[in-house]
C-alpha cells in the first residue's frame, strides 16, 4: 500500500492546468500505466549502522518525498510512487533482495526506477533488480561519491555495495564496469585505491571535478557510456560539499559542487542508456533548515527533466 498523503503542497489553481507541482502529478503505481518514473523508497540505514556511521537515513525517503512534492512539474514522463521497502528487523540481505524484486517489477512494467535511500547499502539491492531485468546487457555503474565503497568486510554495510556488485558480476560472468566520480583521497585508504585498481574500476578525484574541468570530465564520461549498454546511476549525497549537503553521515570537507553533479547526471539521463537511478545517504536528522533536502530534491527533479522513454 502506498501512502499518497505525503504528496501535498501549494496549489496554483488560478493559473490553470499548466501550473502543476509534483504533488499534483504523482500517482500511486497503477497496474497498467504509461511508461514513466517509478519512485521507490528504501527506508534502511542498517548498513550505515554496521559501517559505524550516523544512523537516520531510514527517514530519507519520507523527507525527500516532502521536498519533491512542492517542486514545479514540467511534463516529461508520468510520475508514480511505488512505495517503500523497509529494513526494520536488521536483516539487510533480505531487505536488499526485496528492493531488487521491486526494482525488477517496475522495470518489467516499463518504468524507470528512481530509488530514494536509505544508506548506500541501497546500491546492492538496486543492482540485484537491474541485473535481473537486464541479464544480457553490459551494465555500467556510475557512482557520484566521495568514497569508493569497495570495503572488504565480514558482513554487508553501506561501505561494501560495489565490492558486492563486483562479486556478483564474477559469479554471473559479467564484467564489472564501475566509474566513481568525486573520490576524496582523504576518505579512502591506500588499500581501497588498490582494490579499485585490482577490480579495474575507473575514478576521478574530487579535486578534478571542478566546473572549469567539465570538458575533460564529459570526455571521460562519454568513453564510459560508449562501453556499456545500460547505466545504473547512483548519487551518494556526501559527494556534495558540506555547505550544500550537511544532511549525511559523513559530510564532505571539499566535495563536488551541485552544479557539476547536476550537469553530468543530466548528460547521463539524456544518453538514452539510463536503466535506474538512486539518491542515497540523505539523513534528515542532520539537515539544516531543509538545505540538504532541497539539494537532493533538486537533483532528482533534474534527472526527471532530462529523461525520455
Curated annotation (Swiss-Prot):
Mn(2+) 2 binds at residues 145, 147, 236, 238. It catalyses: N-formimidoyl-L-glutamate + H2O = formamide + L-glutamate. Binds 2 manganese ions per subunit. Pfam families: Arginase. It is an enzyme of class 3 (hydrolase). Its cofactor is Mn(2+). GO terms for biological process: L-histidine catabolic process to glutamate and formamide; L-histidine catabolic process to glutamate and formate; putrescine biosynthetic process from arginine, via agmatine. The keyword Membrane does not apply. It comes from the Bacteria. NCBIfam families: hutG. Belongs to the arginase family. Catalyzes the conversion of N-formimidoyl-L-glutamate to L-glutamate and formamide. This is Formimidoylglutamase. It comes from Chromobacterium violaceum (strain ATCC 12472 / DSM 30191 / JCM 1249 / CCUG 213 / NBRC 12614 / NCIMB 9131 / NCTC 9757 / MK). The gene is hutG.
Amino acid at each position: 500500500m502506498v501512502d499518497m498523503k505525503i504528496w501535498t503542497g501549494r496549489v496554483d489553481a488560478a493559473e490553470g492546468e499548466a501550473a502543476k507541482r509534483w504533488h499534483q502529478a504523482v500517482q500511486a503505481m497503477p497496474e497498467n500505466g504509461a511508461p514513466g518514473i517509478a519512485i521507490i523508497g528504501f527506508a534502511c540505514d542498517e548498513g550505515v549502522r554496521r559501517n559505524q556511521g550516523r544512523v537516520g537515513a531510514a527517514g530519507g525517503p519520507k523527507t525527500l518525498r516532502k521536498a519533491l512534492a512542492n517542486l514545479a512539474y514540467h511534463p516529461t514522463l508520468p510520475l508514480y510512487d511505488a512505495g517503500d521497502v523497509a529494513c526494520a528487523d536488521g536483516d539487510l540481505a533480505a531487505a536488499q533482495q526485496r528492493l531488487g524484486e521491486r526494482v525488477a517489477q517496475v522495470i518489467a512494467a516499463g518504468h524507470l526506477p528512481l530509488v530514494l535511500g536509505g544508506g548506500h547499502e541501497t546500491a546492492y539491492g538496486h543492482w540485484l533488480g537491474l541485473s535481473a531485468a537486464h541479464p544480457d546487457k553490459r551494465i555500467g555503474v556510475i557512482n557520484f561519491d566521495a568514497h569508493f565503497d569497495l570495503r572488504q568486510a565480514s558482513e554487508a554495510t553501506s561501505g561494501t555495495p560495489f565490492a558486492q556488485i563486483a562479486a556478483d558480476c564474477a559469479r554471473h560472468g559479467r564484467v564489472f564496469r564501475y566509474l566513481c566520480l568525486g573520490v576524496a583521497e582523504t576518505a579512502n585508504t591506500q588499500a581501497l585505491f588498490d582494490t579499485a585498481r585490482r577490480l579495474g574500476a575507473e575514478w576521478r578525484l574530487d579535486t578534478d571535478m571542478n566546473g572549469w574541468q567539465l570538458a575533460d570530465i564529459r570526455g571521460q564520461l562519454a568513453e564510459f557510456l560508449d562501453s556499456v549498454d545500460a547505466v545504473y546511476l547512483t548519487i551518494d549525497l556526501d559527494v556534495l560539499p558540506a555547505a550544500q549537503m550537511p544532511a549525511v553521515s559523513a559530510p564532505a570537507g571539499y566535495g563536488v559542487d551541485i552544479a557539476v553533479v547536476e550537469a553530468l547526471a543530466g548528460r547521463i539521463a539524456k544518453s538514452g542508456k539510463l536503466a535506474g537511478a538512486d539518491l542515497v545517504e540523505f539523513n534528515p536528522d542532520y539537515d539544516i533548515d531543509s538545505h540538504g533536502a532541497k539539494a537532493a530534491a533538486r537533483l532528482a527533479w533534474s534527472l526527471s527533466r532530462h529523461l525520455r522513454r
